[in-house]
Amino acid sequence: MRHLLDFQGWSRTEVESLLDTARVMREVLERPIKKVPALQGFTVATVFFEPSTRTRISFELAARRMSADVVSFAAQTSSLQKGESYKDTLLTLEAMGVDAYVIRADSAGVPHQATRWVKGAVINGGDGRRAHPTQALLDAYTLLEALGTLEGKKVAIVGDILHSRVARSGAELLSLLGAQVFCAGPPSLLPQSLPGAHLTPRLEEALEEADAVMVLRLQKERMEAGLVHLEDYVARYQVTEKRLALAKPQAPLLHPGPMNRDVELEGTLADSARSLVNRQVQNGVAVRMAVLYHLLVGREKA
């Protein structure tokens, strides 16, 4: 693969190969010395036109664990504030010898455009509400650890589905790996359609006999219309101990973060043994190591 923008055109075999590499990288991270020279001599730029904590730090750590040089770009302190375009920003980084670009933007399509501007590998770190492929990969990896397989498993995704790039990429990838994906939320926060998923305004339908549950926050920063009343949302859609009892016993809980405790998820559940939130973060580094390795070393071998 030359870039990672979304999962259009991906085969199940390609995804499984990438996740196999992530398992190797997970073993590296469990060593006393958590570093290998696999990307020595390469330069990775994290280009975030939108704020991020987990994705940016995770990618930077992943690159450093493989001995790559890392350039961290922050829009707030860049020449974007002086009117420079995304294109000219990326061309400047290319002139400095960057090999891979992890790009996040609040507008959909920016990573796709970047592939026409620069020669290096482009990784979508999240673009608007469209896609977040590495989050989907780390979620799939975490679920495979917990469940053994996704074939025939029911995965419930609950929350603000309409504005969620995590839901879009997650439904696409999990269904590709054989899961049955049910997305539940208020009618005003459900899209008209979502490839790979069954949409329902009934939380109980999504949770019933679910093998795993992923909870999403309300993305108020993306809401132009359809803003729900917080108290009403909590009353009808918060994942609580009582509601989670509809799922299979010990069904794991996931959350991509950032989490609003006691809004989308009951606080006690966030800290329970069923919560895999911290495991998701740990696995995110390994998965992103695998992505960088496939893109950079794979290119060199091609």
From Swiss-Prot:
Pfam families in alphabetical order: OTCace, OTCace_N
PROSITE patterns to which the protein is assigned, alphabetical: CARBAMOYLTRANSFERASE
Biological process (GO), any one: 'de novo' pyrimidine nucleobase biosynthetic process
Binding site for carbamoyl phosphate: R54, T55, R104, H132, Q135, G257, P258
InterPro entries: Asp/Orn_carbamoyltranf_P-bd, Asp/Orn_carbamoylTrfase, Asp/Orn_carbamoylTrfase_sf, Asp_carbamoyltransf, Asp_carbamoyltransf_Asp/Orn-bd
Catalytic activity entry: carbamoyl phosphate + L-aspartate = N-carbamoyl-L-aspartate + phosphate + H(+)
EC number, as in UniProt: 2.1.3.2
Keyword field: Pyrimidine biosynthesis, Transferase
GO molecular function, one term: amino acid binding
Function: Catalyzes the condensation of carbamoyl phosphate and aspartate to form carbamoyl aspartate and inorganic phosphate, the committed step in the de novo pyrimidine nucleotide biosynthesis pathway.
Family stated for the protein in its record: Belongs to the aspartate/ornithine carbamoyltransferase superfamily. ATCase family.
HAMAP family, A to Z: Asp_carb_tr (MF_00001)
Subunit structure: Heterododecamer (2C3:3R2) of six catalytic PyrB chains organized as two trimers (C3), and six regulatory PyrI chains organized as three dimers (R2).
Stated name of the protein: Aspartate carbamoyltransferase catalytic subunit
Native species: Thermus thermophilus (strain ATCC 27634 / DSM 579 / HB8)
